[in-house]
């Protein structure tokens, strides 16, 4: 990759980070903050502290900047300018849009659409290979020094924030916060992976040649033949592996059943498939 293209890719990443952070901030201000939904993360902490008179944007800056510095000191220099940009820009947009009118005062709608907005924003930030800092950095620090998995660290931090929201506000607000956390996490997955999930099929059949040719000719998908041995008989039992689009999966099942009704088929969701016939990286 030449210098010009590399520069364009870096600029694209920063555009993603800034757009994603802006979407996250606006979603926070129009859905979550006015309805007191502390849906995890630094935004959740700032929602709780806002009820005591602290400005949400200031709280986010006060937490994000020291955490970024701690991350650089304790975890090394991998937290570069992209994380700093997200950590600073998100609270800035929260501050600039603090007087925007709430989109709804219905807590359930706020939790759902706030979670969607936050998820879209954070997902776009991740597409730019960036971060908005906050509790994600705290979780990585705890992960390094406690031995707990990163997922558990994030769950513990978000869980503590939700429980605190239940104490400060009420149990119902805490439940809405849990819903917001769930919706945002699922939306992040959709933004990163997309809706077009594929299916991976592992086919064990005595008619592997016929099945392979049918898949190649009738569905126009590639097939990989994997050598395997039956655990009960110790006989060679080749496995055919193929990945098809969700709309092609029904046709695949019909083809296999027509050729070999006794075929053993294992199916799994392939959340992201790159390469010939599928989307590019």
From Swiss-Prot:
UniProt keyword Cytoplasm present: no
Keywords: Cell membrane, Membrane, Transmembrane, Transmembrane helix
Main localization of the protein described in the UniProt heading: membrane
Matches recorded under Gene3D superfamilies: 3.30.70.120
Pfam families: DUF2179, YitT_membrane
Transmembrane segments: 14-34, 56-76, 77-97, 108-128, 149-169
Protein's membrane topology: Multi-pass membrane protein
The keyword Hydrolase is annotated on this UniProt entry: no
Cellular-component GO terms for this entry: plasma membrane
Localization: Cell membrane
Disruption phenotype: Cells lacking this gene show no apparent growth, sporulation, or germination defect. Also shows no defect in the synthesis of the membrane-bound CccB cytochrome or any other cytochrome with covalently bound heme.
Family under the similarity heading: Belongs to the UPF0750 family.
Protein name: UPF0750 membrane protein YvjA
Source organism per UniProt: Bacillus subtilis (strain 168)
């Amino acid at each position: 990759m030449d210098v010009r293209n590399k520069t364009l890719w870096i600029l694209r990443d920063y555009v993603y980070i800034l757009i994603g952070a802006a979407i996250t901030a606006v979603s926070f201000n129009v859905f979550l903050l006015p309805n007191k939904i502390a849906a995890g993360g630094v935004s959740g902490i700032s929602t709780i502290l806002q009820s005591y008179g602290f400005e949400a944007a200031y709280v986010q800056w006060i937490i994000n900047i020291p955490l970024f510095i701690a991350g650089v000191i304790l975890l090394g220099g991998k937290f570069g300018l992209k994380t700093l940009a997200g950590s600073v820009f998100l609270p800035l947009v929260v501050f600039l849009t603090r007087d925007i009118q709430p989109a709804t005062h219905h807590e359930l709608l706020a939790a759902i659409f706030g979670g969607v907005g936050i998820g879209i924003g954070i997902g776009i930030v991740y597409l730019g290979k960036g971060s908005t800092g906050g509790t994600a950095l705290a979780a990585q620090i705890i992960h390094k020094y406690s031995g707990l998995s990163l997922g558990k660290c994030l769950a513990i931090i978000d869980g503590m924030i939700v429980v605190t929201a239940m104490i400060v506000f009420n149990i119902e607000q805490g439940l809405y916060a849990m819903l917001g956390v769930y919706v945002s996490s699922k939306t992040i997955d959709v933004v990163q992976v997309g809706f077009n999930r594929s299916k991976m099929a592992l086919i064990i059949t005595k008619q592997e040649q016929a099945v392979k040719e049918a898949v190649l000719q009738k569905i126009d998908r590639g097939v990989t033949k994997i050598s395997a041995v039956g655990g009960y008989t110790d006989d060679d039992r080749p496995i055919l592996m193929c990945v098809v689009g969700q709309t092609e999966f029904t046709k695949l099942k019909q083809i296999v059943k027509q050729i070999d009704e006794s075929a053993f088929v294992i199916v799994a969701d392939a959340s992201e498939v790159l390469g010939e016939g599928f989307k590019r990286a």
